[in-house]
A protein has these predicted regions:
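Pepsin/retropepsin-fold aspartyl endopeptidases
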Residues: 1-224
């Protein structure tokens, strides 16, 4: 078991491991590192330095802080991971993690976890993305709500963009919680449709629930 303090930089979970500054990104299929070899939790991994034109220096620039590593689903799926934002901790283990929560089955697309949430009595599928400070929904749903203003966000491969924001009550595990949603640029909206999902849920989910993620076995445990 390895435990790290999380720094939430603008809602993005970042950990320090020796010389490495790591962004934990369940929304990325592949890990990107500043060299082709990464040692993490005593294991060695071969990594991309450049994934479809993306490097950690480009991601650092968009993020607004320096990272050495974007830790994606290919490496994350080797671990059971407990996210505890309230206490600023994340735990990685190859074995079972003792956590008394409610367990549900989840699915995935290219290793990215997909969960079901409910909005306005509609069951919707969301990519569960620790790398997303803002969550996203299609404008066919957000058009029923008042905008609370615009924010700037970025998405690897697309760069920075502005979006209107909407605060929408969302239901998961019998708990209603407020989520700040934006709308994705059309190209990214198409990616969601390819994955058979309606949106992306990020920071607000992890800020409201303690979450144990087991990507390899498509399982999620949660507690309040």
């Amino acid at each position: 078991m390895t435990q790290f303090q999380i720094t939430l930089f603008k809602g993005h979970p970042i950990i320090n491991d020796g010389e490495n500054v790591i962004l934990i990104d369940t929304g990325a299929p592949s890990t990107i590192h500043n060299s082709s070899n990464l040692t993490f939790c005593s294991d060695h991994y071969n990594c991309s330095i450049n994934y479809m034109g993306l490097t950690v220096s480009k991601i650092s620039e968009m993020l607004g802080t320096e990272i050495t590593t974007l830790l994606g689903a290919d490496v994350l799926s080797n671990f059971k991971i407990l996210f505890d934002y309230k206490n600023g901790l994340v735990e990685f283990d190859k074995q079972e993690i003792n956590f008394n929560g409610t367990e549900i089955d989840i699915s995935n697309f290219m290793g990215i976890p997909i969960i079901e949430l409910s909005i306005d009595n509609q069951n919707l599928k969301f990519f569960l993305d620790t790398g997303a400070k803002l969550s996203y929904l299609s404008d066919s749903i957000t058009s029923n709500y008042e905008s609370i203003g615009t924010v700037e966000d970025f998405y690897p491969g697309v760069g920075k963009f502005e979006t209107e924001c909407f605060e929408i009550t969302t239901l998961f595990g019998g708990k209603n919680f407020l989520v700040k949603y934006g709308n994705l640029p059309p190209l990214l909206q198409m990616t969601l449709m390819l994955g058979g999902t309606d949106g992306i849920i990020g920071f607000d989910f992890f800020n409201n629930f303690k979450v144990l993620l087991d990507l390899k076995n498509n399982s999620l445990k949660y507690g309040h």
